[in-house]
Structures are given as C-alpha cells and as structure tokens.
C-alpha cells in the first residue's frame, strides 16, 4: 500500500511551513537569558496527557522526537539516524543516532522509544488510529526497534513526526509506563533545554537551562526538524496575565518575546522601531466551542444543534478579534484558504429562532449551563462572554465561571456533573496542524471516553475517520472528508466560531525566531 501523502495529512500547514525557512544560525551571539512571556501559565508538565499548547511548547523545550516535520512539509529523521520501510509499507525499522542522553544521565534506548509510542498511542487521536493497525512493536537492540502492521496504515512516519497536539515526545520508559489517563509529574527529556524544577513557580515563572549534553543534528533548523541549537544559556517563561503589563514590559526591554499579543495592542507595537510584530501561524487558527457530551443538556443532540445554529461566526469574530485583517468566517471544519479538504458541505447558516426551538425540543430543564471562562487568555475569554450572551438569548440560564487558562485545562478533564466540579462548555482554538484533516482533528473524534475532552461517542465518525486513513486516492479522500463534515454538522461534536490569526512580538535584539505552527525556542539568540 503506498504511503499517504504528507499533503493529505498536514495539508493546512503549507502556508505556515512555507514561511518558516529561517536562515541557519551563524554569527549570532551565544549565551545570556531569553525572557519570554507565554500565552498561559504552565501547570501541566505532561504533553501526552493534555493537548494544551502551553504544555506542548514546554514539551518542545525539554523533549525530542523520533521524526519531525520540516519547513517544506517533509518528515525528516530527528532522534532517528536511519529507518527502513518495506515495499508493502507493513514493516518499519528505526535506528537511533549516537549520543542521545536523557537529562537524568541515562542513555536513550529503543525500549524508551517503544514505551513512549505505546503511551502516546493510548492518548493521541492519530496514535490511537495507528495503534489499532499494529501487529507488534518491539526493541531489537538498544538502538533499534521495529513496527509491524496488522492492517495497512499509510501514515506511520507522519504520525511519529506529527508536530502538534500531541507530538510523540520520547521520555524514559519508567515514565512512559504511566497510564496515559494519568499525568506524568516528572519532566525528564533528552531535548536541548532542561527544566529547572526548583525554580518553577506556577503563576509566575518557568525556567529552563541549556542542556550541555545535547547533540544537535548537523543541519540547518527547519520547522521542527534540523539542528536544535540552544543559543542561550537560560530561558525564563514569565507569566504576565495582564496584557497592559506585558506590553509595558516588552516596550521597556524587560522582556524579549511576547508569544501571543491581544490584537488591540498590535497597532501600538507595530509603530515601535525596537520591536517586530509577526503572525505566528499565517494559516490561522480555528476557534472551537466544545460542549460536554456526557452531561445535560448537551448529551442531547438537539441541544448541541441549538448551539450550532445560534453561533454567528461574524458576530463572534467582531467581538473576539475586531480587526477584519486578522479574521474570516469559515464554513469548513478543516479550515479555509484554498486547502484540499476545505468544503462548505453541510454547513448551516445562523438561525436563532431555530436554535430556540431545538433547545426547547432537547428538554433542557433550565439548570444553569456552566461556561468556563479563562480570563487570562483573550482568545478563549472573549468567546466565552459571547457564548454566555448567546445562551441567554436562547432562554438558558448561564453560570459563567472565571478562572485562569491552566485551571481550565485541568478542569476540562473532569467528567463529573458541573455541580461536582465538571462543566458544560469551554472554548479554545486550534492551529492548522491540528484540524486540517480528519486524521489530526481531535475535536472530530467520536471515541467516547477515549475521545478528546468533551467525549462525543459516534461509531460512524470513527468508521469514517479510519476509512479516510486507509484511503490512498485523493478524490476519494475528499469525498470522505465531506461525509465526515456532514456527519459532524448533524451530530455536532463541536462548533467552530471562526478562523483568525494570532500575532506575536519580540525585540529586534532577538534573532533566529522560527515562524512555525508551534512555538519553538531553539535557534534564538539575544
């Protein structure tokens, strides 16, 4: 069976990756401290347990990957030195490169890799699809392991090198033995930076130091691939939840790099000659309204359909983003922009009266709908406010509960009723890497309690997603994507509230920033 094209797997990343060709670092100053303001507070250290981007970015600081996606959408070896694929693409062999060492001093072995893949495959949505196709996966010696498939799965290399939500980060086997439903509390990787646990102050600061034992590939950095060179001795993540304070700190030179700036600050920062404002992901992000399928009222399809018809993307974008330069309404669950799986099939038009009728048909009993509101994250806080007003316009009672982003990320894992600490709705966003195809889109999964937070159950959705992965003919893949979208707009696993771009900013003394669909802090000097 021929391997599925990377274009099919990560099609939406084309525009992102095409601009990510940062030059190879040459005469840059080395050493010093990079002072970085992340988009949220880091509270969860396990990038397999959660898909939260703050934890993914932490993962890229300290972990490494077997394979990686470069700026040209090519999967390249990273920890792997060489690999082979049988002619029928049913057998794979991977050999690690020399010099790989975990931060605790132990060597990285094939056993660690197999254990990490197994844990990731029990949690990640693409990993689950791959795991379902496995016959066996075993270490051959300390540096080599093999994967044998039971049924065809053309995305093995792409899955092992997926760049986001969740990348396959390699950790020691003793940590990878942790049940994927439980968090790993110890942050031990083999990547270019080490996590300094003693200096971690949740709600304030995260510290990383250069890993002197890390041996980068002798290649130019390219996307998430190539040589990962730590050019600073220390990276400090400084959590500043108040945008005005972060803005003042950046302009005063007290910080170097602000990951996600609120759009109303962009015009001022663009005029500052000492700063550069840039769009972190030119393809944009998809806004996501996620209902809890386990608890009333959204365990009823009619209530979820009420949400779908009540959401007017233009109104959300005007309220959340404001500047049309940075947003557009998009009817496709696979995002818009001339992409292979972009389609308007099945997309309804907003209809508030129909939404009211559907909510009434759902037998909604008037209990308050708990909407989690992360007030420190503009791209989740603002849509929460809009949704609260939309629900009230439908005649629903709303309990808008304020919290920070990291608290919301932890709480959304709770399956209990809202009265016992659970929830009904949360808002987030996903970059192109994470929603562009039926395989990578975690919000589409219908795997029940093994699905992404919100836990929709749909055997038909899982059947179609598995069929999409096995299909090799592009026209048939497009047709399957349309079937999946039609089904999703009927079952409503989530509601898209628009497509938008998120800018970041850094001082011009900062060099080597990689523009990619994930925040990467190697290659940077100050």
Where are these regions (language model features)?
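Extracytoplasmic/peripheral linker and loop segments enriched in polar/acidic and small residues
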Residues: 399-413, 438-508
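Ligand-site clamp/hinge motif
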Residues: 216-268, 397
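Periplasmic-binding protein-like
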Residues: 294, 298-337, 382-383, 488-498
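Long beta-strand-rich cores associated with HINT superfamily self-processing modules
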Residues: 506-526
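Structural transition elements
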Residues: 193, 325-361, 375-382
């Amino acid at each position: 069976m021929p391997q599925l094209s990377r274009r099919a797997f990560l099609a939406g990343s084309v525009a992102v990756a095409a601009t990510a060709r940062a030059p190879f670092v040459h005469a840059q100053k080395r050493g010093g401290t990079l002072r970085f303001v992340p988009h949220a507070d880091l509270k969860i250290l396990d990038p397999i347990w959660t898909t939260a981007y703050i934890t993914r970015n932490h993962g890229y600081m300290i972990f490494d990957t077997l394979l990686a996606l470069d700026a040209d959408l090519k999967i390249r070896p990273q920890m792997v030195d060489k690999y082979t694929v049988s002619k029928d693409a049913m057998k794979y062999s991977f050999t690690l490169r020399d010099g790989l060492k975990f931060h605790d001093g132990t060597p990285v072995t094939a056993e660690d890799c197999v254990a990490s893949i197994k844990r990731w495959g029990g949690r990640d949505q693409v990993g689950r699809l791959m795991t379902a196709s496995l016959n066996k996966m075993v270490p051959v010696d300390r540096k080599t392991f093999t994967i044998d498939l039971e049924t065809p799965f053309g995305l093995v290399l792409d899955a092992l090198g997926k760049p986001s939500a969740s990348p396959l980060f390699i950790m020691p086997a003793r940590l990878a033995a942790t049940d994927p439903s439980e968090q790993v509390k110890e942050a031990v990787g083999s990547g270019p930076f080490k996590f300094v646990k003693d200096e971690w102050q949740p709600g304030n600061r995260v510290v990383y130091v250069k890993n002197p034992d890390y041996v980068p590939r002798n290649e130019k950095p390219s996307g998430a691939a190539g040589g990962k060179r730590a050019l600073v001795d220390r990276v400090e993540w400084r959590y500043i939840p108040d945008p005005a304070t972060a803005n003042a700190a950046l302009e005063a030179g007290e910080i170097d790099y602000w990951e996600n700036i609120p759009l109303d600050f962009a015009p001022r920062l663009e005029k500052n000659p000492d700063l550069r404002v840039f769009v972190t992901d030119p393809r944009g992000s998809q806004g996501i309204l996620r209902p809890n399928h386990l608890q009333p009222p959204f365990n009823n399809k009619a209530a979820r359909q009420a949400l779908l018809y009540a959401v007017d993307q233009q109104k959300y974008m005007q309220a959340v983003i404001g500047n049309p330069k940075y947003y557009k309404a998009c009817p496709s669950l696979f995002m818009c922009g001339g992409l292979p799986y972009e389609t308007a099939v099945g997309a309804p038009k907003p209809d508030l009266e129909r939404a009211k009728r559907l909510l009434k048909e759902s037998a909604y009993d008037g209990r308050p709908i708990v909407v989690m509101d992360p007030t420190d994250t503009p791209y989740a806080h603002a849509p929460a406010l809009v949704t609260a007003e939309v629900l009230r316009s439908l005649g629903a009672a709303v309990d808008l509960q304020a919290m920070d982003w990291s608290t919301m990320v932890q709480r959304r894992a709770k399956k209990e009723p809202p009265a016992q600490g659970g929830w009904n709705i949360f808002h987030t966003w996903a970059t192109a890497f994470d929603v562009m195809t039926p395989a990578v889109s975690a919000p589409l999964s219908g795997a029940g309690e093994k699905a992404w937070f919100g836990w929709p159950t749909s055997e038909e959705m899982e059947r179609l997603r598995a069929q999409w992965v096995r299909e090799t003919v592009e026209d048939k893949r497009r047709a399957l994507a349309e079937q999946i979208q039609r089904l999703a707009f009927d079952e409503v696993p989530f509601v898209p509230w628009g497509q938008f771009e998120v800018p970041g900013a850094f001082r011009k003394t900062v060099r080597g920033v990689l523009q990619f669909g994930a925040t990467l802090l190697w290659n940077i000097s100050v």
